[in-house]
UniProtKB/Swiss-Prot annotation:
Biological function: Catalyzes the conversion of 2 pyruvate molecules into acetolactate in the first common step of the biosynthetic pathway of the branched-amino acids such as leucine, isoleucine, and valine.
Pfam families xref list: TPP_enzyme_C (PF02775), TPP_enzyme_N (PF02776)
NCBIfam families the record matches: PRK07586.1
Oligomeric form and interacting partners: Heterodimer of large catalytic subunit and small regulatory subunit.
Matching InterPro entries: THDP-binding (IPR029061), Thiamin_PyroP_enz_TPP-bd_dom (IPR012001), TPP_enz (IPR045229), TPP_enzyme_TPP-bd (IPR011766)
Residues noted as binding Mg(2+) in the record, renumbered to the chain: D407, N434
Miscellaneous field: Was identified as a high-confidence drug target.
A biological-process GO annotation: isoleucine biosynthetic process
Name of this chain's protein: Putative acetolactate synthase large subunit IlvX
Location of region: Thiamine pyrophosphate binding: 357-436
Domain of life of the source: Bacteria
Amino acid sequence: MNGAQALINTLVDGGVDVCFANPGTSEMHFVAALDAVPRMRGMLTLFEGVATGAADGYARIAGRPAAVLLHLGPGLGNGLANLHNARRARVPMVVVVGDHATYHKKYDAPLESDIDAVAGTVSGWVRRTEAAADVGADAEAAIAASRSGSQIATLILPADVCWSDGAHAAAGVPAQAAAAPVDVGPVAGVLRSGEPAMMLIGGDATRGPGLTAAARIVQATGARWLCETFPTCLERGAGIPAVERLAYFAEGAAAQLDGVKHLVLAGARSPVSFFAYPGMPSDLVPAGCEVHVLAEPGGAADALAALADEVAPGTVAPVAGASRPQLPTGDLTSVSAADVVGALLPERAIVVDESNTCGVLLPQATAGAPAHDWLTLTGGAIGYGIPAAVGAAVAAPDRPVLCLESDGSAMYTISGLWSQARENLDVTTVIYNNGAYDILRIELQRVGAGSDPGPKALDLLDISRPTMDFVKIAEGMGVPARRVTTCEEFADALRAAFAEPGPHLIDVVVPSLVG
């Protein structure tokens, strides 16, 4: 077989059977090889950022890597923002980047670039395959690397390596070694000391077993707990232990951590502010507080379970009760829009949240909704929501996916709607349309750039001129859509979208929070 066939066979034998792709000329042998390996599902995206974001969303729900196929350095560059988010989410991903034929690179053709350097900014593992005979082993190593430490593994494949014969698929990816047991004794001693303690959880600890263990610990010891501001996947809702998220703004996070003498990290990083602000500290750990690392992201749930058995034997974890807000009436606001979502969110839904300022009240409104998963913008690079919803829907076709998306962020990767329509994915996209970059209006004040901004400054934060017609945009990409301005219209549209399989978009008109 040729190199491309060996690559795809090795991927599917290693459990990587979905490939989100935006190919070019140097990847044509990979494209042709798809018909020879029917077990691989290839999905076309119109922009590389959709492919990388979809692979991120897929991994968060499936718990295993997807492949991404990109074209040369510029294609990799186009996908970089959502690769950054995936790196921060600590998800496994195999990125295949096609390159010029080995003998062609010396001619410095127009698309020639330093792919290795670009890949290194987001990848935990990078390798360039130099011969067809090495493709199988290199692909096997990429899969293993992506799963080890949940990271992005990038394999650079020259065109002549793809088309050359003499390649062989690898026998299979070795099983991942079990994590070494964690010594919970020191942290157990801290929690038993009686001094004010806070657990900050992240990684796999924000799913059922980790949440249950952490809730047992808190119940038994009197410690408090928070989860990361932007968790990779937070299981929440009725019947699941409820954890508050660390506040986004530094002032709020500092208030949550005030008085804490011991901060226990279970799969989370030590907290820092997202940006530097004049006169404010970047490190959010209170003065005099000692930081204790219980576990890294990949083994946090197991470490918490062991700690719970040590300090909370027999303790039952409290869980959130079932409750929903009443359906509101009248004009839509951020408050009432959140209540509509909370009142109608289906059981087992996957919520992809990039609602930004418009969604600040969503956590409260959905706290008692039927159990669901909540995916967030881990790396802060906007344009993640629509692509991640694509990947989540591919990973779990039997579950409804609700993408809560802000208008400005949506436009970064709006072509993901086309992929949703092409694959008939069960995704409902809610666009919060306030015609402004509200978060930047807020930050303009917070960074001290001016309490009375002028018209030129405000114009750069206004996206209402011209008004974006998301109904026409969505319909032009094959997604049924409607615009709503009242709570009643929003509720009707949401019910209809949840009742009918396939993609839908609802353009929700809400006022700006800051005028």
